[in-house]
Amino acid sequence: PTLSKNITVRKVKIINEGPNGDGCDPESCEDVLIEDCIFHTGDDCIAIKSGRNEDGRKWNIPSRNIIVRGCKMEDGHGGVVVGSEISGGVNNVFVENCEMDSPNLDRVLRIKTNNCRGGLTENIYMRNVKVGQCREAVLRINLCYEPKEAAKRGFNPTVRNVYMENVTCQKSRYGIL
């Protein structure tokens, strides 16, 4: 969904192993509930966005008040991802009571952005998440995503207030990267 409010995505099963095959991407949305869903994707299971570069800064509409709970995530580049198109900002994301497990799931929680995007990402909460295994990291914050992107630079992003509580992982290469 894009530019929407009061969204509920419940009991949806998404199987898409193709490239750029995200599961659910709320973009510049407010008051979103993603609940009891299953994601098996070739890209990000859930990717929260708010516009890319100049267009995102022009509209300046953040994604906010997003709850992800009771979901199962397999495969893909990230379980819950914020970005990379987050020029309008993202705030108040709550992830709880989810399960993730796959040797093909790269990351559990990922924030990706760069200085073409700018934007404020804040108040990201994850709790009570069980991870069997993931390939790379439980948490990855990448502030230099797509470093060769041909776009105007100088819009430094801000990421603050990222909290994780009772997130367990049996196997990953890194905890935080």
Model-identified regions with their sequence ranges:
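Extracellular/periplasmic carbohydrate-active domains that bind, remodel
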Residues: 1-177
